[in-house]
Amino acid sequence: MGPYLSQPKREKVTTSGEGKSVIFAASEMQGWRNTMEDAHIHRPDIVQDVSVFGVFDGHGGREVAQFVEKHFIDELLKNKNFKEQKFEDALKETFLKMDELLMTPEGAKELNNYKATDTDESYAGCTANVALIHKNTLYVANAGDSRSVLCRNNTNFDMSVDHKPDNNEEKSRIERAGGFVSDGRVNGNLNLSRALGDLEYKSDSKLRPNEQLIIAFPDVKKTELTPQDKFILMGCDGVFETLNHQELLKHVNTTLGNSPVTENLLSKAAEDLLDQLLAPDTSQGTGCDNMTTILVYLKK
């Protein structure tokens, strides 16, 4: 059986909500893929003046994405730097904490419970792109190729950069760790250089966590929000295959129009976007992935 269904699953699971400073809508669609391996989190007002949103794109199975979806917020809230409002450090430490938990016997057991197939070993991992809004400051932590794009002055202000093995800095680390990059893949296998999970690539006891073939350590980008910032578009890589960032923002803005933004309108914008991106068939290979997007509207 190949990676694709004979007909796409167009049904969407959409969730929306509102906080003090944001309105959000999150929508996911399995699409042409045989299984759904995306996951996401959405927590407006997790504590006073802080909202957190995240997308996790699984590979090699759904289990790591589901594990991170379950544990990320709890671990972030427990983090000492989070409590001290040192959010950049808190995000970095929480990404690394996910791998620490996955390496425990309890974590391995929980992963097994999430798995679609009954095997003892897991070779799964996931990307992670997490946006944290504190008052007028936006932080985006990223490991992998999921993305966050800020709509600023009706143009795209990119809040993350993909981590690909053929990037010079990433490739150098991989080679220092004893690996190689072939056809844009680590050791000819994984087309990401940073991810949560993928523990078989993180097993060299002589190397620190940020020196392994694959690392969970995120880049964190920070920006001060302005009145010209309208919304954040977050998505797994399937959302970004067919349209560029400016085209994606234009599509959302067209749906929003000049109407007051509500949960229902934002949900429609998210769902319409996924419909627009879904390929009519699998011949080209793009528009065929699982798709998850979160739209976070910034109240004025």
Swiss-Prot record:
Pfam families hit by this protein: PP2C (PF00481)
GO MF terms held by the record: metal ion binding; protein serine/threonine phosphatase activity
Segments forming a coiled coil: none
Main localization of the protein described in the UniProt heading: membrane
Record flagged with keyword Zinc: no
Xref: InterPro entries: PP2C, PP2C_BS, PPM-type-like_dom_sf, PPM-type_phosphatase-like_dom
Residue positions binding Mn(2+) 1: 57-58
Domain of life of the source: Eukaryota
UniProt entry keywords in alphabetical sequence: Hydrolase, Magnesium, Manganese, Membrane, Metal-binding, Protein phosphatase
Cofactor binding summary note: Binds 2 magnesium or manganese ions per subunit.
EC class name: hydrolase
Catalysed conversion reaction: O-phospho-L-seryl-[protein] + H2O = L-seryl-[protein] + phosphate; O-phospho-L-threonyl-[protein] + H2O = L-threonyl-[protein] + phosphate
Similarity comment: family membership: Belongs to the PP2C family.
Protein's UniProt name: Probable protein phosphatase 2C 3
